[in-house]
């Protein structure tokens, strides 16, 4: 008996295969940290999703494991009605500087947030001082609050600006007049 067209189409459909755990994901699992493995980025950097609550603990563990440099922190919007994403890209720079490694190890931590209400993530400013202005910019452009940040103010937009300009559902005002001349 020949398969029906629906069954034939399903048989030809590609099967989604989970990415193989990279070295950082394996290490986190050995340490008992819950996380979700994501596909590596376009250049092969390991990407890991973590819950906002566990971000500081996992980041501190990674720092003690050699990831001593915050290359960048940022955010992006997956689209109207979708999630906001906060990410931290960490490097293990000291290993290369000391000569104990030939190549820099990299990992990107991602926190997926609902756009409803007030999305928030614990600040990593206390762990990586370089997160200061980067977290402020992410707040300014996407409205993601960073709990525990010492200067939770807008960085680029005027203090009285309404909305978050890099959200994909942002509606630009017709007119804005600066109140203070510089």
UniProtKB/Swiss-Prot annotation:
Membrane protein topology class: Peripheral membrane protein
Lineage of producing organism: Bacteria, Bacillati, Cyanobacteriota, Cyanophyceae, Synechococcales
Subcellular locations according to the entry: Cellular thylakoid membrane
Gene3D superfamilies noted in UniProt: NADH:ubiquinone oxidoreductase, 30kDa subunit
Species annotation: Synechococcus sp. (strain WH7803)
GO-annotated biological processes: photosynthesis, light reaction
EC number(s) per entry: 7.1.1.-
Record protein name field: NAD(P)H-quinone oxidoreductase subunit J
Role this protein plays: NDH-1 shuttles electrons from an unknown electron donor, via FMN and iron-sulfur (Fe-S) centers, to quinones in the respiratory and/or the photosynthetic chain. The immediate electron acceptor for the enzyme in this species is believed to be plastoquinone. Couples the redox reaction to proton translocation, and thus conserves the redox energy in a proton gradient. Cyanobacterial NDH-1 also plays a role in inorganic carbon-concentration.
Enzyme class: translocase
GO CC annotation: plasma membrane-derived thylakoid membrane
Xref: Pfam families: Complex1_30kDa
Quaternary structure annotation from Swiss-Prot or TrEMBL: NDH-1 can be composed of about 15 different subunits; different subcomplexes with different compositions have been identified which probably have different functions.
Reactions performed catalytically: a plastoquinone + NADH + (n+1) H(+)(in) = a plastoquinol + NAD(+) + n H(+)(out); a plastoquinone + NADPH + (n+1) H(+)(in) = a plastoquinol + NADP(+) + n H(+)(out)
Entry keywords, A to Z: Membrane, NAD, NADP, Plastoquinone, Quinone, Thylakoid, Translocase, Transport
Subcellular location, principal: membrane
NADP as UniProt keyword: yes
Gene Ontology molecular function terms on file: NADH dehydrogenase (ubiquinone) activity; quinone binding
Similarity annotation: Belongs to the complex I 30 kDa subunit family.
